[in-house]
Amino acid sequence: MKKILIVGAGGQIGSELVPHLRSIYGNNNVVAADISADKCKALAEAGPFEALNALDGEAYTAIVKKYGIDTIFNLVALLSATGEKNPKLAWDINIGALTNSLYIAKDNNCAVFTPSSIGAFGNDTPKDKTPQDTLQRSNTTI
């Protein structure tokens, strides 16, 4: 049976994905983790939950080992509007969490999934019938 860790579980995608995966794999096989325990009360009541700052590699690794995780979903991201106001903070959080996820997955033989970001696109990207291979000039990168 898969043992899944969803980091950034309290966000827009994670809050929907955790209950769905728990319905498939069982509540105890899907661990939700987020920096904010307050916004994850429903997730914590339904199955395992860990408060985690994904930039803390030691704490992140400890959770992977504690639950015997074999699959990591990295959903950690600063919202685009916040990132536009503070691009360095967005870089530190988004890339830092991704880097930790990749190294921890490699070191613990885990599969890893991390989605792309709408923030990869900018004002010059075509808004209608956007091609698969298109211009990417983010407004939220340094």
Identify the meaning behind each predicted range:
Residues 3, 28-29, 111:
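Residues at the starts of beta-strands that form the adenosine-phosphate
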Residues 3-24:
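N-terminal Rossmann NAD(P)H-binding glycine-rich loop of SDR-like oxidoreductase domains
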Residues 7, 33, 72-76, 112-118:
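SDR active-site strand-loop-helix element
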Residues 26-37:
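Conserved glycine-rich Rossmann-like NAD(P)H-binding loop of the short-chain dehydrogenase/reductase
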Residues 44-56:
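Rossmann-fold cofactor-recognition segment
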Residues 54-93, 122-123:
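NAD(P)H-binding glycine-rich loop region in Rossmannoid oxidoreductase-like domains
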Residues 99-140:
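Conserved Rossmann-fold NAD(P)-dependent oxidoreductase catalytic core, especially the SDR/UDP-sugar
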